Curated annotation (Swiss-Prot):
One of its GO terms (cellular component) is cytosolic large ribosomal subunit. The gene is rplV. It comes from Haemophilus ducreyi (strain 35000HP / ATCC 700724). The keyword Chaperone does not apply. One of its GO terms (biological process) is translation. InterPro entries: Ribosomal_uL22, Ribosomal_uL22_bac/chlpt-type, Ribosomal_uL22_bac/org-type, Ribosomal_uL22_CS, Ribosomal_uL22_sf. This is Large ribosomal subunit protein uL22. HAMAP family: Ribosomal_uL22_B. NCBIfam families: rplV_bact. Belongs to the universal ribosomal protein uL22 family. PANTHER family: CHLOROPLAST 50S RIBOSOMAL PROTEIN L22-RELATED, LARGE RIBOSOMAL SUBUNIT PROTEIN UL22M.
Amino acid sequence: METIAKHRYARTSAQKARLVADLIRGKKVAQALEILTFTNKKASALVKKVLESAIANAEHNDGADVDDLKVAKIFVDEGPSMKRVMPRAKGRADRILKRTSHITVVVSDR
């Protein structure tokens, strides 16, 4: 049984979050949680929170055994970018893009 958890509008770029997502794809959830705990990236905390939510969803909604779960799919899509202005010299301004992403984790007992 597949169970899904999502974090939409996560305040990290999709490119940076994908580096972390690639580390745990296909792993058992216990091993994936250990990897995320010791990964020194901001995105690892965000991905770990979504993974824990997916595990809780599988346990509560589907009655799945946590020991049998593995990360079936994990993907990170781009969310909308917030445009901000940074003042520069001589009255100019640069545009800053504050990027967001949508993190999706699918756990399965197969």
